[in-house]
Amino acid sequence: MAFKGVLNDADVTAALDGCKSAFDHKAFFKACGLAAKSADDIKKAFAIIDQDKSGFIEEDELKLFLQNFCAGARALSDAETKAFLKAGDSDGDGKIGVDEFAAMVKH
């Protein structure tokens, strides 16, 4: 698992189970334990999710967000992806930077 040492496997499994039918980023971050983690751990999570290492999480990476936690997890729907991007993209540039991600995880 990519998040070994950052998140508890059982918490991640429970969080993934909770979003099989609908994705709510706030509920997911809380359930998987990321919301309670340190700034350094949140940056580590960001680096894992930023698949192309661009320094940003773009829409295509958000669509596959859950698969970072478990390879067999579902892709987010287009509507879920757009809502997730809108929630995290505070400066309106169409992508989520590390500071935006940290703010989204914590709130």
Curated annotation (Swiss-Prot):
Tissue specificity of this protein: Expressed in both white and dark muscles (at protein level). About five times lower expression in the dark muscle than in the white muscle (at protein level).
Record flagged with keyword Hydrolase: no
Gene3D superfamilies: EF-hand (1.10.238.10)
One GO term describing the cellular component: cytoplasm
Keywords: Allergen, Calcium, Metal-binding, Muscle protein, Repeat
Pfam families per the UniProt record, alphabetical: EF-hand_7 (PF13499)
Signal peptide: none
Keyword Repeat among record annotations: yes
One Gene Ontology molecular-function label: calcium ion binding
Domain EF-hand, residue spans: 37-72, 76-107
Ligand binding (Ca(2+) 1): 50, 52, 54, 56, 58, 61
Binding-site list for Ca(2+) 2: 89, 91, 93, 95, 100
Family to which the UniProt record says this protein belongs: Belongs to the parvalbumin family.
Function: In muscle, parvalbumin is thought to be involved in relaxation after contraction. It binds two calcium ions.
PANTHER family for this protein: PARVALBUMIN, PARVALBUMIN ALPHA
Name of the protein described by the UniProt record: Parvalbumin beta
